[in-house]
């Protein structure tokens, strides 16, 4: 009887290990490949597209146009750093002080959860993982973040982030966002336009770049002040990000 009970558990354990090993090979290969090859689509894009189809929205298209950093306005990279991760050039994927502050805040305010994800973590999550807040996903995100921080340069991380970030319903990447909202290529985005796009990033399905609320306008102004305090374009040059 005991052998019959143990056998299924052993099978499940081996199956789980094989799945994890296969995922590790898949993700590791993806990290290596996308260190030099443009990203055709992300996990978030695939998730949005499949959800739309399952919901009967057959006209939905998760649209993205890959562009190199040379074809992106330096203001755009600076804007997302100012908005999302001002220590991006310094850390190895995790902003520990920010994580500690977020944990302390969330203990006091359970109804208003604050995140502390760096651009590296967001890139790993958007590229390879699903939406959610489970400990499993967080653990996988941490491993993938270490992987891309080890293999990719900071410039590459920022380039991929800007090409797969969600800026609105079906709008992925800064080139698609620039064309949709401002009718111009990403290379020609101004300071204020870049700050406006960065202002919707906390929740691009709630906040609209083409119909900005008072909160979005206020956040846009704050981001522009932070961009100046960081040093403007010289920040990007100094940290070899453009």
From Swiss-Prot:
Principal subcellular localization: membrane
UniProt cross-references to InterPro entries, sorted A to Z: Glyco_trans_51, Lysozyme-like_dom_sf, PBP_transglycosylase, Pep_trsgly
Keywords of the record: Cell inner membrane, Cell membrane, Cell shape, Cell wall biogenesis/degradation, Glycosyltransferase, Membrane, Peptidoglycan synthesis, Transferase, Transmembrane, Transmembrane helix
Reaction(s) catalysed (UniProt annotation): [GlcNAc-(1->4)-Mur2Ac(oyl-L-Ala-gamma-D-Glu-L-Lys-D-Ala-D-Ala)](n)-di-trans,octa-cis-undecaprenyl diphosphate + beta-D-GlcNAc-(1->4)-Mur2Ac(oyl-L-Ala-gamma-D-Glu-L-Lys-D-Ala-D-Ala)-di-trans,octa-cis-undecaprenyl diphosphate = [GlcNAc-(1->4)-Mur2Ac(oyl-L-Ala-gamma-D-Glu-L-Lys-D-Ala-D-Ala)](n+1)-di-trans,octa-cis-undecaprenyl diphosphate + di-trans,octa-cis-undecaprenyl diphosphate + H(+)
Annotated transmembrane regions: 19-39
EC number: 2.4.99.28
This protein's pathway: Cell wall biogenesis; peptidoglycan biosynthesis
One annotated GO molecular function: pentosyltransferase activity
Family matches, as Pfam families: Transgly
GO process terms (BP): cell wall organization; peptidoglycan biosynthetic process; regulation of cell shape
Membrane topology reported for the UniProt record: Single-pass membrane protein
Compartments reported by the entry: Cell inner membrane
Domain of life: Bacteria
GO cellular component assignments: peptidoglycan-based cell wall; plasma membrane
UniProt family annotation: Belongs to the glycosyltransferase 51 family.
Function statement: Peptidoglycan polymerase that catalyzes glycan chain elongation from lipid-linked precursors.
NCBIfam families, A to Z: mono_pep_trsgly
Record-linked HAMAP family: PGT_MtgA
Protein name according to UniProt: Biosynthetic peptidoglycan transglycosylase
Species this protein is from: Salmonella enteritidis PT4 (strain P125109)
Underlying gene: mtgA
